[in-house]
């Protein structure tokens, strides 16, 4: 049969256990996002169970499905990183052997001076910080002085937080574009992130108008090849930001995981050849980093409910792949991402059920498989598993 469309859904930060080199990335060898959320009574994911989530190599918790509807694998990250950018690039075919720069002690003095000159404003904070805590600790000073809150994390990011009443959102976006130009060469961070917030001290709240300005991928991804070949490449959520707009033919903004799945379900009613690439960031942003086990579990439960709406609406020729880009164990130390294996489940008419693909050694196996499904030649270090799962 002819396969015409792939829905690739990334559950941002849904790791399933520590990778062998987790210690090199500052993580304990016990980190396990799935295991942590399974301690919550808010978790109820029968549809993912039926697809084979608990049958995946290394997943020791949860009841195995005797007859899984999907084929499945555990994916190990080949790239040197544990962040959104590196993870998504690898899913799309690019393995990063060199880690992107990080700033555990804050940004160098010369960089701060360049940013201040470009913005015409002073900078405060300049250290790794939790996004919610930083606006609590520096928001009042920002509102009194107009100085911008610039901070980072364990990831390769420069984040700029500003109150919408002090810096209009469009102006904040312009500052981020300027920062993207300045953060080049050895300082080419993966993402510049606009972090607008509202409210009064001490009850500041971040708004959904976050915007990411990513470094462009260093080579062609499967998205580029699909688009050049005339296929539609639809991004839902922050995919467009992660790839700096490269290889995207249509972008759909979302406000939440739930909104993202509603948009994905709506795409099932459209008719096109290509890829619909979905990122659901709430797992990471709202629950993983905030170490909110119950919140993470409840979000997975809601995703699973919507997955139950999605699956029966799939058409002949549609393929669904569910995966993740890294971990963010809500019971882990600190507030940052965790270096973890991720799940992969592939489902659709014409795809074998219950094939256990074991542990595979690159997220790029997904890109290699997408290239085979869509019959687009693409050179990547990933290895396709299409022959093993197609009927």
Residue spans for each PLM region:
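Feature captures the catalytic ectodomains and active-site-proximal regions of enzymes
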Residues: 1-391
């Amino acid at each position: 049969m002819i396969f015409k469309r792939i829905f690739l859904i990334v559950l941002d930060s849904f790791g399933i256990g520590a990778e062998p080199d987790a210690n090199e990335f500052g993580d304990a060898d016990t980190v396990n996002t799935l295991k942590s959320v399974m301690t919550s009574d808010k978790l109820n994911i029968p549809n993912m169970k039926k697809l084979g989530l608990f049958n995946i190599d290394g997943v020791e918790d949860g009841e195995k499905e005797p007859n899984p509807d999907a084929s499945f694998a555990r994916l190990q990250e080949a790239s040197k990183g544990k962040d959104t950018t590196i993870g998504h690039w690898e899913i799309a075919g690019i393995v990063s052997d060199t880690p992107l720069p990080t700033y555990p002690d804050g940004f160098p003095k010369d960089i701060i001076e360049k940013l201040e000159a470009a913005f015409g404003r002073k900078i405060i904070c300049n250290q790794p910080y939790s996004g919610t805590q930083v606006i609590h600790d520096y928001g009042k000073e920002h509102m009194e002085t107009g100085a911008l809150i610039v901070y980072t994390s364990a990831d390769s990011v420069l984040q700029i937080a500003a109150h919408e009443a002090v810096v209009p959102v469009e102006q904040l976006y312009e500052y981020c574009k300027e920062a993207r130009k300045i953060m080049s060469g050895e300082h080419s961070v993966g993402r510049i992130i606009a972090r607008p917030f509202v409210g009064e001290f001490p009850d500041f709240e971040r708004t959904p108008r976050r915007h990411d300005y990513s470094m462009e991928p260093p080579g062609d991804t499967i998205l580029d090849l699909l688009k050049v070949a005339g296929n539609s490449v639809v991004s839902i959520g922050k995919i467009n930001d992660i790839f700096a707009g490269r290889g995207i033919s249509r972008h759909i903004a979302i406000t939440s995981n739930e909104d993202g799945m509603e948009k994905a379900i709506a795409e099932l009613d459209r008719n096109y050849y290509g890829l619909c690439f979905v990122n659901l960031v709430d797992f990471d942003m709202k629950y993983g980093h905030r170490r909110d086990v119950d919140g993470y579990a409840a979000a997975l439960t809601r995703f699973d409910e919507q997955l139950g709406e999605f699956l029966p609406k799939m058409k002949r020729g549609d393929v669904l792949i569910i995966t993740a880009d890294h971990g963010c164990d809500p019971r882990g130390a600190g507030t940052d991402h965790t270096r973890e294996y991720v799940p992969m489940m592939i489902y659709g008419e014409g795809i074998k059920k219950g094939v256990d693909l074991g542990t595979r050694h690159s997220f790029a196996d997904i890109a290699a498989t997408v290239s085979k499904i869509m019959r687009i030649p693409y050179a990547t270090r990933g290895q396709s598993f299409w022959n093993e799962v197609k009927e």
